[in-house]
Amino acid sequence: MRKRYNIMLMSCLAFLATVPCQGLSKKERVVKKQIRPIIEAMSVRDKVAQLVFVDVYPGGDSAFQAKADSIIAKEQVGGIILMEGNIARTAETCNRSQSLVKVPLAVTIDGEFGLGMRISEFRKYPRQGVLAGLPDDGLMYEMGRQIARDMRSMKIDVNFAPVVDVNLHPDVNTIKDRSFGPDKNLVADYGSAVMRGMQDGGVVACAKHFPGHGDTEVDSHKALPVLKFPKERLDSVELYPFRRLIKDGVEMVMVGHLLVPVLDTLPASVSKVVVTDLLRKKMKFRGLIITDALGMEGVLEPFGGSGAKATLAAYKAGVDILLMPDNVSESIDLIVDYIGDDRRKLKDLDARVSRVLALKGTCGKLTGRDDLSVDPAAVDTKGTDALITTIEETLAAGR
């Protein structure tokens, strides 16, 4: 059943809001039935809040945790992204966060090199630039499967990986060894392998940073990078791995805070030309589209530092998930005001909420509260330890 997971979720994401139940599989019909009453009971503000994912810090102090709890409880957001902590504190944070909401949260993590990137007891896999030295992509698939096992044991639904940026100039590029390197075919092959491993294991993978952060000298955390090349280059290099992963069934794409002058005068993450016209329509991506973190300077800069205005612009561009907006309450208010009682905008909102709820339903988050609790005793790091050892030995043998 796990090998059919990615096929079922992509089908749900693409068609749940529009296809009659008779045309869906049994699993999809169950998810659709779970979603319908949830959406019908929601106000417009409730629906917008489902598109907002906020950060939680299991290793943070009590004051920070209290602030995060307050936002989750008050706004009833749709998901969380886990930051640094250990297994016990992360489990406690997940369980407490779930207890604060009526509609269960999607739980996500930025684990480019496994859970060890955020959870202290796990070893870290080598960076993607190092993994590019493996003789083939077989171990990349196994790595994806093991990451999924680890994440499912902690009830984590989404991993914001792999990075499929093509890094043509590693000496000056900000992505550096987060990328598989300068060969677009290897980036696509290895990125697809780890993506398929995760999704076959029941975790949603996320290709990033669309349309390509691999040839930029500026860090989008600090300023707005500019991709200064023609459409032909963008299409043949930067977009190539994304096109491959979309073909291979990736369920989520993260849009970066990147300025692409040949496409638009706005950053990609807030550009309808990039998000809707290019990714959704031209490249025919039917899955979930998420922004990079909305508190980064690369996206705040064009809006005079206003996180709420940047978040509204991202919504207008067509993204499904708004990641880590600076001011959650104000951001939701602006989007609700923008939608108003416009029937077309309300229908579009329902479609986006349906995609987010379909993610939760397919990951088992809508079946009952017993399925939400994380048990630290059920988490085992041995599988990761063994696989990392195998990977390191394989890399050493190839030198």
Region annotations inferred by a language model:
Residues L13-C21:
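Hydrophobic h-region of N-terminal signal peptides that target proteins for export
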Residues M1-M8:
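Bacterial N-terminal signal peptides that target proteins for export
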